[in-house]
């Protein structure tokens, strides 16, 4: 599918979708629990549906009721799945469920779509093998399809922190119900650390204790997942909100604003988008008590931003940089190349097609907004929901029509993105 976006002025109120990261973790935590847990206000998207299906294949149940997800847990010992677990495009599902599958007393096979089958899982496979299980890639390259044999009983394991923080999350969540717990020692600096903070936040809400250590993280074994009141409410998603906030900062109508609701403080690192916009000179206000962020169109200036902990913000920041005066330098970005696509290369290519002056480096993306006049063009979302949404925001301020291929991939995290954008006044047929 293709979506077109034409130059537009936007205004009004919108609510960002619930957090994808929190929804994934809440669904699996509810799977680890005994009995029934209601996950309230979840994100229902292609990725989170993949996690719900995995919970069912591991012996639990996940039913939609009145906008919530009612999950019946499989407890501390998942069943051996009677089919291959298809994680579709969801790397979070594959990493978290691979560790869960290592608790089963038997063999589990996991796969995904073409994009997911190109993403790295080797450090997690090595860790599970070091904990007493057997975990391997069928192609011997650390990529799916994966075959996992359990059960693991716990222990200590070393793994790199600069490939994916999801490996740590997977081991913490599974480790709580092992006999002895799991301790991870990180051999390299942890990238995307706020995502582990999200995990610790969810574990705490489910009554599970885990902590950071001098060398990594530790979770005690023999714990039980038991959320207060047998329910858990998912907060709003700052990654998704970033596109709406960027739209307001770049394209709000004169005297008007874009107001994004449901944005209460949480452990999400991508709340940093508010600080980034402030540093660029945006007229933005966050009422943390009400969870409302208001942003008006402003003259922006380039800044330097490190994305070691916020890889999902790179596409948004790159678009802001293309429309700002001066140079925006996005650093600590090498790990962003291992997402649904190589987001550094993809944004460099797409913004260049739109007329931006962009320089791609191994660990950086440099956008020279002062040398840029954005013009509409046909660009490819590369099957990556975050590229599609960021490029749609660029289309609001490009001269002429911007056509984005692969617009259907917004279903991964923000299924009604184009409807929300149109509701704010954008000229789009997405």
UniProtKB/Swiss-Prot annotation:
GO biological process, one term: aromatic amino acid family biosynthetic process
Record bears the keyword Cytoplasm: yes
A Gene Ontology cellular-component term: cytoplasm
Keyword Hydrolase applies: no
Enzyme class: transferase
Binding residue positions for 3-phosphoshikimate: 20-21, 25, 164-166, 192, 312, 339
Biochemical pathway: Metabolic intermediate biosynthesis; chorismate biosynthesis
Active site residues per record: 312
Amino-acid positions noted as binding phosphoenolpyruvate in the UniProt annotation, renumbered to this chain: 20, 91, 119, 166, 343, 386
CDD domains in the record: EPSP_synthase
Start and end residues of each stretch annotated as Disordered: 1-20
Catalytic activity reported: 3-phosphoshikimate + phosphoenolpyruvate = 5-O-(1-carboxyvinyl)-3-phosphoshikimate + phosphate
GO molecular function: 3-phosphoshikimate 1-carboxyvinyltransferase activity
Subcellular location per the Swiss-Prot or TrEMBL entry: Cytoplasm
UniProt KW keywords: Amino-acid biosynthesis, Aromatic amino acid biosynthesis, Cytoplasm, Transferase
EC code(s) of this entry: 2.5.1.19
Assembly: Monomer.
Family: Belongs to the EPSP synthase family.
Record-linked PANTHER family: AROM/DEHYDROQUINATE SYNTHASE, PENTAFUNCTIONAL AROM POLYPEPTIDE
Function: Catalyzes the transfer of the enolpyruvyl moiety of phosphoenolpyruvate (PEP) to the 5-hydroxyl of shikimate-3-phosphate (S3P) to produce enolpyruvyl shikimate-3-phosphate and inorganic phosphate.
Protein name listed in UniProt: 3-phosphoshikimate 1-carboxyvinyltransferase
Organism this protein belongs to: Halobacterium salinarum (strain ATCC 29341 / DSM 671 / R1)
Gene that this polypeptide is encoded by: aroA
């Amino acid at each position: 599918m293709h979506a077109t976006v034409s130059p537009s002025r936007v205004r009004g109120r919108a609510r960002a979708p619930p957090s994808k990261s929190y929804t994934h973790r809440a669904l699996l935590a509810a799977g680890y629990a005994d009995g029934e847990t209601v996950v309230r206000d979840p994100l229902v998207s292609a990725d989170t549906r993949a996690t719900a299906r995995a919970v069912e294949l591991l012996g639990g149940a996940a039913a939609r009721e009145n906008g919530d997800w009612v999950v019946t847990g499989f407890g501390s010992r998942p069943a051996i799945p009677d089919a291959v677990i298809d994680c579709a495009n969801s790397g979070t599902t594959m990493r978290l469920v691979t560790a869960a599958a290592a608790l089963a007393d038997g063999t589990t096979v996991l796969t995904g779509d073409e994009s997911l089958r190109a993403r790295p899982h080797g450090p997690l496979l090595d860790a599970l093998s070091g904990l007493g299980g057997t975990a391997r890639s069928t192609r011997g390259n650390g990529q799916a399809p994966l075959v996992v044999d359990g059960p693991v009983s716990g222990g200590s394991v070393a793994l790199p922190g600069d490939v994916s923080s999801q490996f740590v999350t997977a081991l913490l969540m599974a480790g709580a119900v092992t006999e002895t717990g799991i301790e991870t020692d990180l051999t390299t600096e942890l990238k995307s650390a706020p995502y582990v903070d999200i995990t610790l936040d969810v574990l705490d809400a489910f009554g599970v204790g885990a902590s950071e250590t001098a060398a990594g993280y530790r979770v005690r074994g023999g714990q039980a997942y038991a959320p207060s009141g047998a329910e858990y409410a998912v907060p709003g998603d700052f990654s998704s909100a970033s596109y709406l906030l960027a739209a307001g900062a770049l394209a709000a109508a004169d005297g008007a604003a874009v107001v994004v609701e449901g944005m209460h403080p949480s452990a999400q690192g991508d709340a940093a988008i508010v600080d980034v916009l402030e540093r660029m000179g945006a007229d933005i206000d966050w009422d943390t008590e009400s969870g409302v962020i208001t942003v008006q169109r402003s003259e922006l200036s380039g800044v330097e931003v490190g994305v070691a902990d916020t890889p999902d913000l790179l596409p948004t920041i790159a678009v802001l940089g293309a429309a700002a005066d001066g140079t925006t330098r996005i650093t600590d970005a090498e790990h962003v190349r291992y997402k649904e696509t190589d987001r550094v290369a993809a944004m460099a290519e797409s913004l260049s097609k739109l007329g931006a002056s962009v320089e791609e480096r191994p660990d950086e993306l440099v956008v020279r907004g002062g040398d840029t006049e954005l013009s509409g063009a046909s660009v490819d979302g590369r099957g990556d929901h975050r590229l599609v949404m960021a490029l749609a925001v660029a289309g609001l301020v490009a001269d002429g029509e911007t056509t984005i291929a692969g617009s259907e991939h917004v279903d991964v995290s923000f299924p009604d993105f184009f409807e929300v954008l149109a509701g704010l006044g954008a000229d789009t047929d997405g």
